[in-house]
């Protein structure tokens, strides 16, 4: 990937990365990014705080907080890797809308699933991270690639499906990863892109399927 003019191609992606880094440094300076109480204080996800105390803003703020340096490094690398392509495809404003709605959708999906299926986890889990929103970007790219006759710039439908599958598999097998939020973000981003993306060229589904397989 050529990063020489990244700031012109994807200013929103760079701004999101910068915001995440600023929030990370803030939580480190004012406590620790790996301290659960400190993260809760600055806006991490906690189900009962939303359902009982109506602190709905946590659905957004949690997406800008990270537990430790490796957590933010992994998420920001993926965002830089994927974000510029989708930002160029959608435009800056639509891309930002998709990112933020995916963050909310990811956190909401995870919270509701825990509330319905695992009340114990719902009551004791504090979570944070941009990965739900990043998976929204991946979901958006999946739709954009498929809708654009199986290719978007240097990305093919097959590449995107393999990448999405491997990323989701890593989340399922790694400890402490909220795979429910990943899935919620992926689906939210995919659906949002169905409404926001207007391809320059269109192809029939048989042609797209041939490129996938």
Regions found by a protein language model. Give the residues of each.
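A detector for small-residue-rich transmembrane helices and their helix-helix packing motifs
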Residues: 1-213
């Amino acid at each position: 990937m050529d990063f020489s003019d990244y700031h012109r191609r994807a200013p929103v992606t760079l701004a999101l990365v910068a915001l995440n880094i600023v929030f990370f440094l803030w939580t480190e300076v004012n406590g620790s990014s790996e301290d659960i109480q400190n993260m809760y204080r600055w806006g991490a996800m906690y189900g009962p705080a939303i359902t009982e105390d109506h602190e709905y803003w946590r659905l957004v703020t949690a997406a800008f907080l990270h537990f430790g340096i490796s957590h933010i490094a992994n998420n920001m690398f993926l965002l830089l890797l994927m974000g510029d392509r989708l930002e160029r495809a959608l435009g800056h404003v639509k891309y930002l809308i998709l990112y933020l709605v995916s963050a909310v959708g990811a956190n909401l999906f995870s919270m509701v699933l825990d509330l319905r299926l695992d009340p114990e986890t719902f009551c004791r889990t504090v979570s944070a991270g941009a990965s739900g929103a990043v998976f929204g970007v991946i979901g958006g790219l999946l739709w954009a690639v498929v809708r654009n006759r199986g290719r978007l710039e240097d990305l093919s439908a097959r590449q995107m499906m393999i990448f999405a599958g491997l990323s989701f598999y890593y989340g399922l097998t790694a400890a402490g990863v909220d795979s429910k939020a990943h899935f919620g973000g992926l689906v939210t981003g995919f659906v949002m892109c169905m409404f926001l993306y207007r391809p320059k060229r269109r192809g029939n589904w048989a042609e797209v399927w041939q490129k996938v397989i």
